[in-house]
């Protein structure tokens, strides 16, 4: 029975890893659909390369910094040979270490790719490659160690089930810093400072990306085939649906008509917000996560 449960956990974790991996395509579609056609190639290349660089550097250095020991601030073992962290049976955190590593690798890549959308259409490709290497080597692994690797945040009871902080906030803060450095897109604001809408060239593609992103993270983060998978999926779905509805209503009232791009971004906001606590919130608690604040376009 124990071996059967381990096999089920392996299969489910790999399914979760592939779902999160496919989120790379979702992010690429959202970013490409919401930007101008002339920049599509650049955006697709950035999304591809942050996964490629993340896979290599997280394997060589990042995994060790994140899970290599119980130091409160940084991992100290497993550099260049992360499989050395496994026990005598090749297991790590209840899974074969290769399974656990690929699951964590796709999380690292997701954190990296968040920045691409925030700096779309105004970032040099070489600069983005340098950033992708940096977040995969030390930014994401070190902060991830604090939360999931036995670091100081986990020691004081910090709870982040699937990455609201470890993945999305880390990527979001990097995106904020990058957006501050490069500034707004040319033509985004008038001389008086009034924002000007820059419509995306392919809204159906953006919508498809949103749906691909819907369930990717949370259910797989159990890394086990457990009875609460349905509860996690339901809470995730309700939070995203409620955030979408709230955003639709707010934008409709504010702008006089529904706004598809803002509404789809509202869905993403709900998904990000529920990620940390989707395994512990009760029925209707998801309503607390449904108040994104639309800004002027």
Where are these predicted regions, by residue range?
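Hydrophobic alpha-helical transmembrane bundles of multi-pass membrane proteins
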Residues: 1-291, 295
């Amino acid at each position: 029975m124990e071996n059967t449960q381990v096999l089920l956990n392996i299969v489910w974790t790999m399914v979760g890893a592939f779902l999160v991996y496919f989120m790379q395509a979702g992010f690429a579609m959202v970013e490409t659909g919401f930007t101008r056609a002339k920049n599509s190639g650049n955006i697709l290349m950035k999304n591809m390369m942050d996964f490629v660089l993340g896979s290599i550097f997280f394997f060589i250095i990042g995994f060790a910094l994140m899970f290599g020991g119980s130091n409160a601030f940084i991992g100290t073992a497993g550099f260049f040979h992360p499989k050395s962290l496994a026990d005598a049976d090749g297991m790590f955190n209840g899974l074969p270490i290769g399974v656990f590593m690929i699951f964590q690798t796709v999380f690292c890549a997701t954190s990296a790719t968040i920045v691409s959308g925030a700096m779309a259409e105004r970032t040099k490709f070489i600069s983005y490659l340098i950033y992708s290497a940096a977040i995969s080597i030390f930014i994401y692994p070190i902060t991830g160690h604090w939360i999931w690797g036995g670091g100081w945040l986990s020691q004081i009871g910090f709870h982040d089930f699937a990455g609201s902080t470890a993945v999305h906030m880390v990527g979001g803060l990097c995106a904020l810093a990058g957006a501050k450095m490069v500034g707004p897109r040319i033509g985004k604001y008038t001389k008086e400072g009034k924002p000007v809408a820059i419509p995306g060239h392919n809204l159906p593609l953006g919508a498809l990306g949103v749906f691909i992103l819907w369930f990717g993270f949370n259910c797989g983060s159990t890394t086990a085939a457990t009875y609460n998978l349905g509860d996690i999926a339901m809470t995730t779905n309700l939070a995203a649906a409620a955030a979408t509805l709230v955003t639709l209503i707010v934008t409709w009232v504010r702008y006089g008509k529904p706004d598809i791009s803002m509404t789809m971004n509202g869905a993403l906001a709900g998904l990000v917000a529920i990620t940390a606590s989707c395994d512990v919130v009760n029925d209707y608690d998801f309503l607390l996560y449904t108040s994104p604040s639309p800004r002027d376009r």
